[in-house]
Swiss-Prot record:
<comment type="function">
    <text>Catalyzes the transfer of the diacylglyceryl group from phosphatidylglycerol to the sulfhydryl group of the N-terminal cysteine of a prolipoprotein, the first step in the formation of mature lipoproteins.</text>
</comment>
<keyword id="KW-1003">Cell membrane</keyword>
<keyword id="KW-0472">Membrane</keyword>
<feature type="transmembrane region" description="Helical">
    <location>
        <begin position="186"/>
        <end position="206"/>
    </location>
</feature>
<protein>
    <recommendedName>
        <fullName>Phosphatidylglycerol--prolipoprotein diacylglyceryl transferase</fullName>
        <ecNumber>2.5.1.145</ecNumber>
    </recommendedName>
</protein>
<feature type="transmembrane region" description="Helical">
    <location>
        <begin position="69"/>
        <end position="89"/>
    </location>
</feature>
<comment type="pathway">
    <text>Protein modification; lipoprotein biosynthesis (diacylglyceryl transfer).</text>
</comment>
<dbReference type="GO" id="GO:0042158">
    <property type="term" value="P:lipoprotein biosynthetic process"/>
</dbReference>
<feature type="transmembrane region" description="Helical">
    <location>
        <begin position="138"/>
        <end position="158"/>
    </location>
</feature>
<keyword id="KW-0808">Transferase</keyword>
<dbReference type="Pfam" id="PF01790">
    <property type="entry name" value="LGT"/>
</dbReference>
<feature type="transmembrane region" description="Helical">
    <location>
        <begin position="215"/>
        <end position="235"/>
    </location>
</feature>
<keyword id="KW-0812">Transmembrane</keyword>
<feature type="binding site">
    <location>
        <position position="151"/>
    </location>
    <ligand>
        <name>a 1,2-diacyl-sn-glycero-3-phospho-(1'-sn-glycerol)</name>
    </ligand>
</feature>
<dbReference type="GO" id="GO:0008961">
    <property type="term" value="F:phosphatidylglycerol-prolipoprotein diacylglyceryl transferase activity"/>
</dbReference>
<feature type="transmembrane region" description="Helical">
    <location>
        <begin position="27"/>
        <end position="47"/>
    </location>
</feature>
<keyword id="KW-0997">Cell inner membrane</keyword>
Length: 279
């Protein structure tokens, strides 16, 4: 396999030849990165789609709640995503506590961001006397927007590349060790976690009665994301500071296992919860 990868290096696509630049706009005194725009785009499109979802009969919240939720979700993404990255992926940052605040240096965890959003939903729901589980159902349908743009931004940044491979679409990333052709795993994740999962959730929301079964849509999201992430991790290069863990899984796969279990549970038990009358 290693010899085949090396032999394929001459035909591999070079990321540097694509003309990509992590900086979207450079004003001299201010640089706007594609990664920042990805977060903003994901949040705004997610909010817009959420307003369409809650316009349907039987929605668990009003428009004003959706507007408030954007604030809590954004805080949850930033705080949860950063803290989880520090604790699970880069604990050495804790030796310099102020570095935890340096979000512009990169380092966010989806699993932590998801927990942060869940905490924000729970707080907002309790504060307004709403069903936190049903709000999760609706928000889950919007999450693929952020996942898609986030992974595309990873690709534009030339980071989180895949494992060495000899496939015809292999790419050479400038920061990858050994200069070997690798899977563009960022695009795999964008396709599975963003496009495919988004279409699946859209089908279940608009074409079935799933939105009236509390917990079913968020269960589908957890299961769909979990399966996508678990599989793509076999094509994605493990984090250099962690590698493959002693039990044979990467950290990403390990953190995904609870999502798979939770998703299966929510789907299996959705029919046992009180159905919502959408009339």
């Amino acid at each position: 396999m290693q010899q085949a990868v090396i032999a394929n290096a001459a035909q591999a696509i070079h990321w540097a030849d694509l003309g990509l630049n992590p900086i979207a706009l450079d004003l001299g005194f201010l640089q706007i990165h594609w990664y920042s725009l990805a977060y903003i785009s994901g949040i705004l499109l997610g909010w817009y789609y959420l307003t369409r979802l809650i316009a349907q009969p039987g929605a668990p919240m009003a428009r004003r709640h959706a507007d408030d939720l954007v604030f809590y979700a954004t805080l949850g993404i930033l705080i949860g995503g950063r803290l989880a990255y520090v604790f699970f992926y880069q604990p050495d940052i804790l030796l310099h506590p102020l570095d935890v605040l340096k979000l512009w240096q990169g380092g966010m965890s989806f699993h932590g961001g998801a927990l942060g959003v869940a905490a924000g939903i729970f707080y907002m729901a309790r504060r307004n006397g709403l069903s936190w589980l049903r709000i999760h159902d609706y928000v889950a349908c919007c999450a693929p927007f952020g996942l898609f743009f986030g992974r595309i931004a990873n690709f534009v940044n030339g980071e989180l590349w895949g494992r060495p491979t000899d496939v015809s679409w292999a790419m050479i990333f400038p920061g990858a060790p050994d200069g070997l052709p690798r899977h563009p795993s960022q695009l795999y994740e964008a396709g599975l976690e963003g496009i495919v999962l988004g279409l699946v959730l859209s089908f279940f929301f608009w074409r079935t009665d799933a939105r009236n079964q509390p917990g079913k849509l968020v269960g589908i999201f957890l299961l769909g994301y979990g399966l996508s992430r678990f599989v793509v991790e076999y094509f994605r290069e493990p984090d250099a500071q962690l590698g493959t863990l002693s039990w044979g899984l990467t950290m990403g796969q390990t953190l995904t296992v609870p999502m798979l279990i939770g998703g299966l549970y929510l789907i299996a038990t959705a029919s046992k919860r009180t159905p919502i009358n959408a009339d």
